[in-house]
Amino acid sequence: MILPFELDRSQTAPIYRQLYQRFRESIADGRLRPGDRVPAVRALAAELNLARGTVEAAYQLLIGEGYLTARGAAGTVVTPQLAPVCAPTQRAPAPPTTHQATHAGTSPLALQMGLPALDAFPRKLWTRLAGRQLRQAGVEGLVYPDARGYAPLRAAIASYLGISRGINCHPEQIFVCAGYRACLDLISHTLMGPGATCWLEEPGYFMARNALLEAGAQLVPVPVDDQGLDVAQGIARAPEAGFAVVTPTHQSPLGVSLSLPRRLALLDWANRQGSWIIEDDYDSEYRYQGKPLPALKSLDQQGRVLYTGTFSKVLFPGLRLAYLVVPAEQTPAFARQADRLHNHCPHLQQATVAAFLNEGHFARHLNKMRGLYARCLLYTSDAADE
């Protein structure tokens, strides 16, 4: 396929942006119609004498905005459902003002925090793994699952945390729950008495606030600055608080990281007071620059940190699968409450995640998504500079 446009290498605009713009113009004026197949990345790179990464960057941007649709082995096509658009030379009447932006004429853009790129999720692979787990499931897969979680998944999580987050724990210390909210419910039923005082980041994660209020906790807002939770302010406001809920790696919603001096100060306070730190380590797999920081739990020598993580923000939110790591001596108490609450996930989902981890798909998916998000950051930065 010979595309009806050329690139001007004398322009200051990046080549991938030119390529992206030429595709948009060709789609707008009808030279490329909905359903038309576009060249493969390798073929177009050879045709235009470009690096494959340049073509891939343009394609990813067009896919992200809904102009193209990737169909795996079937190739990439102009999105069939794409609404007709006007050529750039024709000025259309201004649309009425609306608070809801649309995504290439189709569905609204999803801009909520913590939502992964769902169009990049390996659905076929996931379906194959789930089907295999279902076929191989014995009686264990058809009855109520272990309230503590599927044993192979707990073992896989323990291995993953040791490698990626510096946390040394045994599978018996891990409890698989139906989302972060379920982790908080398990903690509150096991350790929190009526009216327990709890530090909470301000601003902080609204779901944590709601869950703790429903548990009857008395919340003490503690300000957050560019170093994360202000531990000195927390001590000044409620020195004898029994709990502190923090997002040290990627603060919600400000995105800052808790500095090492603050981490040590928080642990020192918890050790002296016998208080509990609830570490929400969501999104720790990603950083704008550098490698992820080790978890706060990895510095915990006295067993005062209750560590929570989730796969929902890395894989897909509908998974509703989180996990909680508790100190070894607290395992029996948490196990009793887990049996009573039944906040567990279906066996099939847990078994599929275990296979995804154990067979190396999770690590490959993370690497792929890190590259994708880095390109998205680049595109956003370029667009902001224009």
Where are these regions (language model features)?
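Conserved core of the PLP fold type I
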Residues: 130, 135, 140-274, 285-286, ...
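N-terminal basic, amphipathic alpha-helical segments
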Residues: 1-133, 142, 153, 329, ...
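Conserved functional loop/turn residues at catalytic and ligand-binding sites
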Residues: 31, 66, 216, 281, ...
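Active-site PLP attachment segment
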Residues: 73, 298-333, 348
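Short glycine-rich anion-binding loops that position phosphate/pyrophosphate groups of nucleotides
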Residues: 116, 248-252, 313
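A short, hydrophobic C-terminal helix/tail in secreted or cell-surface proteins
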Residues: 382-386
